[in-house]
């Protein structure tokens, strides 16, 4: 046999896959697929939990805010404080969980303290002002009108996300935004009003303008949070999410407390408690649980930004807005009419459209990952065999 023939045989043998090596590759590929499937399952489990936090927290907190005003509460700054001051309930969980996540959170470059403080202060100031504007709107507007204007936060968020987060507005997403907005818009045509205190035309206009501004501010805050995770903090992990919630809430709470004392509303709190319709205990419990439920909403909203995007977080928030009139049927004995039913159906339809878009994105990402894996070059076994023959 000539040297050329021997070399051809060796090259052919090198091209033929080694059964042992092939089995190892199949085993590795199978393990990677199982890990990927497990991670996807855990991710969507977290998304489901965060979604429940957003809807339940926002719904209960809004109902409690309405109860506070309807039963004699009148302090706009106190209503702002309770939206923000509940963050200390997270500290025990944050401390206990820090050690568990510390090993993975130390990887990567550290953000400079100056940039980190700047992010928390700017977002905290915006959140504090935003919550105050929402408090004014809830005081002067009917729930149906308030829900209508709050739905506009989704459009504002889509606008800011397009410029700040490079969010692609696909036809499915646009359909989702349209349906979610219409679902809350229908509530404006509801002629049935609650027994809330009558307001003047000037107060109504003030509440309308403040709620529009608050909706725009909320959409901006969500986009800025997502931008901060990607560009400034440059890490998306448990610690960053908890730090974002706690420190932003701390700054915003300081802003609201300063506003409470600067406006002199704190002087009327004692008489407000004494004259509260259901007594002092009910007054205190209302404030405490309002603070807790708003913090649950904050956890869910920030978690959805961390897992998906600010636009998805806002879509879930808008989905929960029609739930408030539904619960009002049970709590305040309001009547359920056709508009409320249609509103809920459209909200669920819009939410389903957005989830379907997320499913398509994940499917395409997984397909691209599989293509990249299959196109990776094999180890140069043939070359090694050839050089050994020489």
Curated annotation (Swiss-Prot):
The keyword Heme does not apply. It is found in: Membrane. The chain crosses the membrane at residues 44-64, 78-98, 117-137, 140-160, 169-189, 204-224, 241-261, 287-307, 312-332, 336-356. Disulfide bonds: none annotated. GO terms for biological process: purine nucleobase transport; response to nematode. Residues 370-390 are annotated as: Disordered. It holds the Pfam family PUNUT. It is a multi-pass membrane protein. Keywords: Membrane, Transmembrane, Transmembrane helix, Transport. The keyword Lipid metabolism does not apply. One of its GO terms (molecular function) is purine nucleobase transmembrane transporter activity. One of its GO terms (cellular component) is membrane. Belongs to the purine permeases (TC 2.A.7.14) family. PANTHER family: OS09G0467300 PROTEIN-RELATED, PURINE PERMEASE 21-RELATED. This is Probable purine permease 10. It comes from Arabidopsis thaliana (Mouse-ear cress).
């Amino acid at each position: 046999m000539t040297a050329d023939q021997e070399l051809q045989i060796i090259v052919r043998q090198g091209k033929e896959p080694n059964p042992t090596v092939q089995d190892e590759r199949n085993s590795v590929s199978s393990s990677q697929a199982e890990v990927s499937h497990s991670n996807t399952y855990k991710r969507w489990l977290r998304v489901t939990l965060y979604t429940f936090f957003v809807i339940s927290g926002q719904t209960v907190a809004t109902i409690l805010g309405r109860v506070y005003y309807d039963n004699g509460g009148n302090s706009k700054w106190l209503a702002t404080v309770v939206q923000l001051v509940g963050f200390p309930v997270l500290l025990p969980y944050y401390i206990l969980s820090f050690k568990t996540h510390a090993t993975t959170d130390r990887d990567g470059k550290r953000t400079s303290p100056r940039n980190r403080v700047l992010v928390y202060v700017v977002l905290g100031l915006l959140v504090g002002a935003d919550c105050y504007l929402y408090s004014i709107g809830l005081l002067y507007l009917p729930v149906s009108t308030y829900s209508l204007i709050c739905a506009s936060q989704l459009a504002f968020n889509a606008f800011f996300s397009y410029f700040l987060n490079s969010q692609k507005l696909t036809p499915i997403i646009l359909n989702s935004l349209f349906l979610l907005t219409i679902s809350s818009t229908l509530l404006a045509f509801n002629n049935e009003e609650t027994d809330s205190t009558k307001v003047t035309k000037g107060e109504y206009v003030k509440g309308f303008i403040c709620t529009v501004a608050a909706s725009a501010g909320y959409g901006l805050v969500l986009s800025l949070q997502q931008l901060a995770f990607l560009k400034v903090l440059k890490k998306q992990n448990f610690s960053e999410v908890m730090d974002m919630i706690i420190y932003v809430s701390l700054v915003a709470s300081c802003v609201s407390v300063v506003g409470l004392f600067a406006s002199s509303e704190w002087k009327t709190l004692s008489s407000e408690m004494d004259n509260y319709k259901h007594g002092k205990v009910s007054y205190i419990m209302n404030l405490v649980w309002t603070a807790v439920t708003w913090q649950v909403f904050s956890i869910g909203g920030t978690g959805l930004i961390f897992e998906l995007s600010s636009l998805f977080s806002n879509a879930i928030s808008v989905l929960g807005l029609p739930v408030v009139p539904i619960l009002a049927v049970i709590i305040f004995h309001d009547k359920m009419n056709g508009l409320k039913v249609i509103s809920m159906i459209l909200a669920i339809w819009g939410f389903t459209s957005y989830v379907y878009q997320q499913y398509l994105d994940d499917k395409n990402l997984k397909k691209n990952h599989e293509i990249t894996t299959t196109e990776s070059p094999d180890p140069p076994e043939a070359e090694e065999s050839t050089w050994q023959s020489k």
